[in-house]
């Protein structure tokens, strides 16, 4: 792909700060790298229910894509639900469809068929993963369905690993009394936060060098301070300012 004249003038092969960051060149801070490793471990060890929360623009969806890429070659069979305005039985049908299993008419029948499917995957040595993005949109009833899915197990291991991804409102919903059983099943909760000021400098270097700068371009400390102050370390806001 030919670089835009603007980027080519700077010696870059592409836009280093696109509106949608690519998962292949994800920037890991030490705390995020630790959280990522723990999430991967929880899924591979079939521990069950993981929660990932953070404000809009902190890279949750990009991190999910990186996670799915990482797990793809490790015998993990995954379903990714992006339309969380589907509720109850419609949500279960979407989960079944994305896992490659025909939808059924009722929740009870769907859970029974899904259990059979997951047992077969488990016996084949595959890990089954359900990721629900924008999970703050789920109703209490749909989250109760998630709890039922959490209960599917062999006795020692969970048949379906679940990763709920959402904004902080999801934490508030899970704190409701009627969802205490679901909340108690969380084995790992990772909260994303904005970059610190020194991380903004490293993030700039990481993105600009990945686009071909090879150390020729840098950001002045005073500019990094202003960028951090204006964006609070929010990745989406950083990209909007620098694009």
Language model region names:
Residues 45-66, 84:
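Walker A/P-loop nucleotide-binding motif
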Residues 7, 86-87, 102-145, 154-158, ...:
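Mid-core helix/loop region of P-loop NTP-binding domains shared across ATPases and GTPases
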Residues 50, 73-83:
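Conserved catalytic segments around the Walker B and adjacent sensor/switch elements
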Residues 1-46:
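A short, basic N-terminal segment
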Residues 121-125, 129, 154, 163, ...:
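Helix-loop-helix "sensor" segment of P-loop NTPases
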Residues 41-45, 70-74, 120-125, 136-141, ...:
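Conserved catalytic network of the ASCE P-loop NTPase/AAA+ motor domain
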Residues 12-19, 76, 86-105:
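Conserved NTP-binding/hydrolysis module of P-loop NTPases
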Residues 53, 129-133, 161-167:
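Structural recognition of the conserved hydrophobic beta-strand(s) that form the central parallel beta-sheet
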């Amino acid at each position: 792909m030919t670089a835009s004249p603007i980027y080519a003038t700077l010696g870059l092969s592409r836009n280093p700060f696109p509106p949608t960051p690519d998962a292949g060149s994800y920037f890991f801070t030490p705390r995020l790298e630790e959280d990522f490793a723990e999430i991967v471990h929880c899924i591979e060890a079939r521990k069950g229910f993981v929660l990932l929360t953070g404000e809009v623009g902190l890279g949750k969806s990009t991190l999910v894509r990186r996670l799915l890429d990482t797990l793809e070659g490790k015998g993990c069979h995954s379903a990714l639900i992006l339309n969380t305005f589907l509720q109850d039985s419609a949500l279960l049908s979407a989960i079944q469809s994305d896992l490659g299993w025909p939808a059924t008419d009722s929740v009870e029948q769907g859970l029974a068929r899904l259990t059979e499917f997951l047992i077969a995957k488990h016996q084949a040595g595959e890990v089954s993963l359900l990721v629900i993005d924008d999970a703050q949109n789920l109703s209490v009833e749909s989250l109760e369905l998630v709890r039922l899915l959490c209960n599917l197990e062999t006795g020692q291991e969970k048949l379906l690993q679940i990763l709920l991804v959402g904004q902080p409102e999801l934490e508030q919903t899970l704190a409701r009394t009627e969802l205490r059983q679901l909340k108690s099943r969380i084995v790992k909760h990772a909260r994303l936060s904005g970059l610190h000021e020194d991380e903004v400098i490293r993030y700039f270097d990481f993105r600009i060098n990945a686009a071909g700068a090879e150390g020729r371009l840098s950001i002045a400390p005073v500019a990094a301070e202003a960028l951090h102050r204006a964006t609070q370390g929010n990745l989406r806001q950083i990209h909007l300012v620098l694009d």
